[in-house]
Design a protein with these regions (language model features):
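Hydrophobic N-terminal alpha-helices or hydrophobic patches in metabolic proteins across all domains
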Residues: 22-222
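Classical Sec-dependent N-terminal signal peptides that target proteins to the secretory pathway
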Residues: 1-21
Length: 222
């Protein structure tokens, strides 16, 4: 329990330690972040030649603001709820949070209609940053009966990059999976069902299936 409390305190200390990026443009009026060179959802490849995946950051570790990719995929926006900028009423995010480009969990399969969510372990990142990550596994979850799985990844160049599986991560950083599970089970103030953690083989199948749904959805729109 002491490790868990300490972890969250460290998150708050680094809450505003953001890194500048010339490619990222912020419009305070629209609470929107864009990259002038690419569409976050459609223009970024999923897989790299070394087996890592590309992840787009939506929410930096430690933040309480709820940023999310818009429906066009070209901007990450601070969500509105009842015309109020959305913030979570809980401790800040324990990891960086983002999505895998060119993926979709459609409503037909009981998905939420969004790209696949990712938790990125490593240093605090910035909104709109594209990061190469190694996949360790997946936290299987349901949010109000919808599939809400989270891919567990590590930033390749970080301390956590030494891990190659969930089992490795538990040895490298004892208590970290418990922290993540406790946080996601409670941050909304309503019951989220944590089902299980899955290994890499099942996780990659989940990602590839989500890419298939994304491509099928593109075909329907054309």
């Amino acid at each position: 329990m002491k490790k868990i409390i300490y972890f969250f305190l460290i998150n708050f200390i680094f809450l505003f330690d953001y890194v500048n990026s010339e490619e990222i443009k912020v419009s305070k009026k629209l609470y929107s972040i864009k990259n002038s060179n690419i569409n976050f959802l459609h223009d970024v490849a999923i897989f790299n030649l070394d087996g890592s995946i590309n992840v787009v950051v939506e929410i930096p570790a430690g933040s309480i603001e709820k940023w999310k990719l818009n429906s066009e995929g070209d901007a990450i926006e601070l969500e509105l709820k009842n015309n109020i900028l959305r913030k979570i009423d809980y401790l800040g995010y324990p990891t960086n949070y983002g999505f895998i480009p060119k993926t979709l969990l459609p409503f037909e399969i009981n998905g939420d209609g969004d790209a696949v969510d990712v938790l990125i372990l490593g240093k605090q990142l910035i909104i709109g940053q594209i990061v190469r990550c190694n996949v360790l596994g997946m936290l299987e979850m349901n949010d109000q009966s919808l599939i809400d799985n989270k891919i567990i990844c590590v930033e390749k160049e970080s301390y956590f990059g030494k891990a190659n599986s969930i089992a490795d991560l538990k040895k490298l950083a004892p208590g970290i999976m418990e922290i993540i599970e406790i946080w996601f089970a409670n941050y909304k103030g309503e019951k989220i069902e944590i089902i299980r953690t899955s290994k890499k083989k099942k996780t990659f199948k989940f990602i590839k299936d989500a890419n298939k749904y994304y491509l099928e959805n593109l075909d329907k729109k054309q």
